[in-house]
Amino acid sequence: MSEQKRVIYTKEELAAKVKVPAIVEQDLKRIISDRLEQCGLYYRCFSRIKTASSMAHKFALKDYGAENKKLQDLVGVRINLYFDDDVEICQNIVENTFDVIGWSTSERSEEEFKPTKLNGVCRLPEYLRSEISTETWDMYIDDTFEIQIKTMFFEGWHEIEHDMRYKGEELWKNYKGFSRYFNSILATLELCDKSMVTLFEDLGHSLYKSGRWSDMIKSHFRLKLGEGQLYPEVAKLLDEDCDQQVENLAKRIYKTSKQTLVDQLLHRSRKVPINVNTIIALLNDSQFHDSRLTAIFKERDVYNDGREESLGESWHYEMKPLIRHNVFQMCTQVDGSRLKEEKTASAAEIFQQAADAIYGWIVGKYGGLFKEMPQKTSTYHADICLLYTS
């Protein structure tokens, strides 16, 4: 790859041309956080906009420009998860929320341990792309953002590893013993991630054997649960069913994967309280179809039991497509005889002048509020629509 093809920008040039409003970073973080909250995962979410200094440093190191290669992490979002098995679940949520271009993961070998993280490159939603200065796209900067997913155990050491080893290889030259020692720490963290999930799975199985249904659900699914107590009639049904059937309802709940439950929570058109009752109700609606449970939950109105309405709740869902209905229609006649033209104006010309006059009044009245109003009218096309991305 020839040096002539490399593109380098100065910090001052990038600072002058690349303008990213805070709303871009904030909205991406909000969209992701809302989806994770909706399904009850334990997580922390952070975001950042790349500084001009950081971009200049990266352009100096990488071969941007060659084969149209562009910087893809102008905006970055980091998701830290508490359970290792939630990484794949979170990846699926991202893929169902954004236009994902591709994923990459840490290279791992038998000789070396590194912080395990999953990096995704996603296309910016159009409404957020339009907020960024247009000069940005004239440079070798892609209209994408980066999502990084990793566990909390590795998050604790990732920044140290990134700065002290990835960017500081000279520290470890001729000191292989210290490097192996550092690797052993990272190996311990990886073992902790796996062991934590195994611990709760084993605990959940023991709770199932003991008939402690609420605790079994909490340990097995490991989601943020509300304070709702298991309905007595549901507990009684699970007890009776456990005594009579080999493939009883409680066992079927325990054998249901966390991914299946998360999918059901995300597919609801409205956010539901997450507790032991709604979990069983969701699994029954989608997997078990037990008429006895259906009757109990219908009587209890389970999905509204304990609901706390919030003004921000609508942020969790995509807006449904609007249906076109004629609710008002008026026929207007414009008298063009008073137009001072050398020749008689056509109907189209009369209409255009009338439209310009009306729009001129609107701009004069509201132009101060809406800075992006077009300067003139244009022909309406039925295939033009606005797309709002939640």
Feature map (PLM): residue ranges:
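Active-site metal-binding core of divalent-cation-utilizing nuclease and nuclease-like domains
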Residues: 368-383
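Conserved small/polar residues in nucleotide/adenosyl-binding loops
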Residues: 388-389
